[in-house]
């Protein structure tokens, strides 16, 4: 297995259905999609062509379901896709192509906000300020002792402070589309 895609999920079925339409057709025998249901147990999830793991209780943070995904992932490389975001129609093929061309410890990909009000072009972006785990492909060997903390916010920033080490690669294409979901954890931060 070359790639594991890990998606933490909690009560955003409408968004997830849009992601399924784009991502599910891209899945191959080299790629697994793991969706971690963080305590909402929606029946619709079981119809998706992915490994679904149902957690009994809501953890209240994205780190716990992401850690479950890391624990069961079989891919040599791992990436995270939030359930309320979208990916390009060639998301998987571009990542697999990069994996086949070279080895790396992590790979950054360009992304933009769905409403196009903000973007990150990795030709100019610096990995030391990358505070999100989506938009990054990680070599699983480098994550053996790296896990998310249980904070409600900034857990991905803390994760990346440890994980973004070693040989870096970049995919210049815009493969990831971030959605600022008004009901999501980031939008409701009261820091």
Tell me the role of every PLM-derived stretch.
Residues 2-4, 32, 158:
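Cell-envelope/extracellular polymer assembly enzymes that use nucleotide-activated donors
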Residues 15-17, 41-49, 86, 90:
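Acidic helix N-cap motif at the loop->helix transition within catalytic regions
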Residues 56-73:
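Glycine-rich, basic loop-to-helix element that forms the pyrophosphate-binding segment
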Residues 78:
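Short aromatic/hydrophobic "clamp" motif used to bind/position activated sugar donors
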Residues 86, 90-119:
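Conserved donor NDP-sugar-binding/catalytic core segment of glycosyltransferases
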